Structure formats: C-alpha cells, structure tokens
Amino acid sequence: MPSYIVVGGQWGDEGKGSVIAYLALKDEPEVIARGGVGTNAGHSVFINGKKYAVRQLPTGFMQTKARLLVGAGVLVDPEVFFHELEHLKDFNVRGRVGIDYRCAIIEEKHKQLDRSNHHLHEEIGTTGSGCGPANADRVMRRAKLAKDIKELEPYLTDVAAEVNDALDDGKLVLIEGTQGFGLSLYYGTYPYVTSKDTTASAIASDVGIGPTRVDDVIVVFKSFPTRVGAGPFPTEMPQEEAERLGLVEYGTVTGRRRRVGWFDFEFARYSARINGATMLALTMLDKYDGEAFGVTDYDKLPKRAKEFVEEIEERVGVPVGLIKTGPELEHVIDRRENI
C-alpha cells in the first residue's frame, strides 16, 4: 500500500484539516503520522456538527483504527499534548498515540520569549506558542527531548521505525503537514515565515521516511487564500471586500482575523512545483460560488465553479483530485479515480 503526504500550498489555513479528516475516514489508513513545526498551527474539523481543533496530535484522530504518530521533527508541548488527549477522549486517542522519543520539547521559557520578543511578536507576528525559540534551542543542541520528560514515557516510540515498518508490511500511511508553503523558512516570504521548512520534503523527513517511499503528494489550496500576521500578500483584498464576500475568518491558534486575497495562480504553480505535487485539493469552493455548496458530484457543479477548477488545473499544471464544497466531512467531491 502507498504513503501520501498532505501539505498546505499557501500561507496555512487552507483547510488541510478537513481534507485529512476525509482521507482518514474514506481511505482508512492504518498509520497517520504528523510532521511540521509544532503547536503553532491548528487544524479544525467538523464531525457531526461539532468542531474539533488540534495543535499537537494528528488531524486524522477520528479514524479510530489508526495508529497516531508525532514525528521526530515536530516540537512537543506536554501541556497541549495532555490537553488534547483529554479533549479527544471519545476517540480513544490515548491508547493509540505515539511520540518520537527524539521530539524537542517546548518549555514555558520558550513561550514567554516568543510572546515578549518585540521582533517576533510585533513585527513578524508569531503565534506565541514558543516554537521559534524551541527550535533555536534545538539547533544550539540544548533543547530537552521527549525522552527527558517522565510524563511522556508511556507514549514514546521510534516513529521513523514504525512508519517504515508499516510501509514494509504493505500498510497505508497518511502523513500530515502543517502551515503552508508560503511560510517555509527557506521558500516562503522571509522573514515573515515559520521556524523551519514546511514543504513535502521536510514533512517526510520529520516522520523519518525517504523520498522514494512517498507515493503521492497532495497540496491543498483555498479558493480565497488567507494569511495571519504580517508579511507580503500580493493578491490581498481590502477588509471591506472580504466582508462583502462573507470571507471573515479568525485563526485557530491566535484568534486573529485572517487577511484574505484572490487566488494567485502563479504562486500556486510555484508551490505545487517545489512540493512535487501529484494532486491538488481545493477547499471552500462554495465560498467562490455559493451554488456549489454541498455538491458531491463534479458533473453537478455550477458552470462558474467548474470553470474555476479547470482554470486551476490548466494554469497550475496539476489535476484537482479533491474538492471541498462545505465544512462537513461529507461535503467533498472525490475525483481521484478519474485522474
């Protein structure tokens, strides 16, 4: 069975959580591993009308048959980790989750520095979760690791070994990325970026698999891209225009209002290229065309919505395999068998 990576193609908040949740339930992967930076990114999913938000654990938690893993490249905040174990107790997460023993730890001092540093908090617009300072400590080889935290002992494992063993055994592995391409430390709008790379290559490294073991890369794009905090946003629209279009959103972690823009085809093409996208997922098509809300058959999409999808495929050069037409898990058009 294959492995596939899901990453964001813009500045985060693309709707990766809803795409991952759909794949987790539809494809029934036996292992779901989270890469990415740490607790600075929140993923939200709606299940039976109830909203669940996670910052530490894999977003595919609702697939109760899956082993849930947090890769060595991910920063762990024990406070957030144990909160989410309790928050998701209805899904028996506690008995299924494993943290790589090499994960670096976010301490209270990291969060305090993140929030008090003028450059990070006021100019860059950090989430204040402590990820940047914690990653800096890791680079300086002075960060604590998960194996140093007694409370985490029951959950420690070698994630890289587990993931590769699963692939050797023919199991389906879903790998989650966080944030988005535009926030990559290397390829994003530096210095208004996160504290490490966020591309598919980095996410694979985070969980310990080599590039030849990745079968598909799904890059997620939002019909109207958004951005939280400072930094260039070439296609940004005025707040008044966003309000007129009903595009008022707030960040999962920070609660700050998101900046909204028009779809940037050139940026999307570059993002898809660097990520090595084999397929795109498009979210919030119903915001682009209200008549697309809840549609699950591509042939039944209204003309305007369908033309938008086709323009993305033509100009980005990658097929759109998944389309979200609403917030619920079932609001999906799945075209993967046809591409």
From Swiss-Prot:
UniProt keyword Ligase present: yes
EC number: 6.3.4.4
Binding-site list for IMP: 13-16, 40-43, 127, 141, 179, 194, 256
Active site: 13 (proton acceptor), 43 (proton donor)
Catalytic reaction annotation: IMP + L-aspartate + GTP = N(6)-(1,2-dicarboxyethyl)-AMP + GDP + phosphate + 2 H(+)
Source organism, top-level taxon: Archaea
Residues binding GTP: 12-18, 42-44, 258, 284-286, 324-326
Positions contributing to substrate binding: 252-258
One Gene Ontology term, aspect cellular component: cytoplasm
Localization of this protein: Cytoplasm
Family: Belongs to the adenylosuccinate synthetase family.
Entry protein name: Adenylosuccinate synthetase
